[in-house]
Amino acid sequence: MALKELRIGTRASQLALWQANWVKSELEKRYPDMTVTLTKIKTIGDKILDVPLAQVGGKGLFVKEIEEAMLRGEIDIAVHSMKDVPTEFPEGLGLYCITEREDPRDAVISNGVKFADLPQGARIGTSALRRQAQLLKVRPDLEMVIIRGNVQTRMDKLKTEGLDAVILAAAGLNRLGFADQITEMLPTDLSLPAIGQGALGIECNLSNQDVKDAISFFNSPDTSRAVRAERALLWRCEGGCQVPIAAFGEVTGDQLKLTGFIASVDGKVSVKGVVTGPADDCEKLGVKLAEQLLSEGGHAILAEVYQREVSREKEIPV
């Protein structure tokens, strides 16, 4: 049965609305008779802007309230930045589509100065412990300044906070038309992306076949396999915003190459690895690499990181 209406739930940030409106536009092009509406929902991650995400604690900081609206039957689908999506879902809900990936790399915005040329002790604004750890690993002299807010707000902090550079996801900058502000793209061997970075995920009630049929065209098989491998690694490591974990999957033909990274927040201790195998075994490859990283020092790193989190108690996977 063809759907007459589809209700999209989204955060209200500039980037989230761009993403949700893109999904809305694609649906309207494909189904001219369908009425597609947006519902803006404020998440806890949007409400708490004066504290680093690592200190807020918990998972799903940018999705929980949206999922609750779906469970109440107020929306049919949710559009998320994949890097915000936890590896576990409320009963009945799930990730049904992962869109083709935008540029997954991190970007430097500065006053025209490339990363390698930043002065000794340069102040770098970032919202991610993952970036902080990787950049400190190669430049321990840098001063990392945690910045929060939407893309424009974080870009503005280059001036308002007296920063030498800010590091942001290239995908968001490209989507919002800020590509001309980028000084340099960081190669993935220097700054491995966040899990799912650059891809969008569409979540729905998995029992609603009509909705699943309507949105299935959004799924990119190659991006989906790459991101599912990354997410399997994260799931095995039980990571969230509080831990510097990064992974990047690349599909070529029927093969998948997955690179993973776990580090201490200061970047002084880290472990990195690579696995390759059939792309159809994406989740098995993610777990395999996670177990390799954990056995080669990742377990001790995570134990140390979690030990410092007085607000959380968890068992570190062995």
Curated annotation (Swiss-Prot):
Catalytic activity: 4 porphobilinogen + H2O = hydroxymethylbilane + 4 NH4(+)
Disulfide-bond pairs as recorded: none
Keywords assigned by UniProt, alphabetized: Porphyrin biosynthesis, Transferase
GO molecular function, one term: hydroxymethylbilane synthase activity
Pfam families for this protein: Porphobil_deam, Porphobil_deamC
EC main group: transferase
Entry-linked SUPFAM superfamilies: Periplasmic binding protein-like II, Porphobilinogen deaminase (hydroxymethylbilane synthase), C-terminal domain
CDD domains according to UniProt: PBP2_EcHMBS_like
Record's cofactor remark: Binds 1 dipyrromethane group covalently.
UniProt pathway annotation: Porphyrin-containing compound metabolism; protoporphyrin-IX biosynthesis; coproporphyrinogen-III from 5-aminolevulinate: step 2/4
GO biological process: protoporphyrinogen IX biosynthetic process
Protein purpose: Tetrapolymerization of the monopyrrole PBG into the hydroxymethylbilane pre-uroporphyrinogen in several discrete steps.
Note: The porphobilinogen subunits are added to the dipyrromethane group.
Name of the protein in question: Porphobilinogen deaminase
Species per Swiss-Prot/TrEMBL record: Citrifermentans bemidjiense (strain ATCC BAA-1014 / DSM 16622 / JCM 12645 / Bem) (Geobacter bemidjiensis)
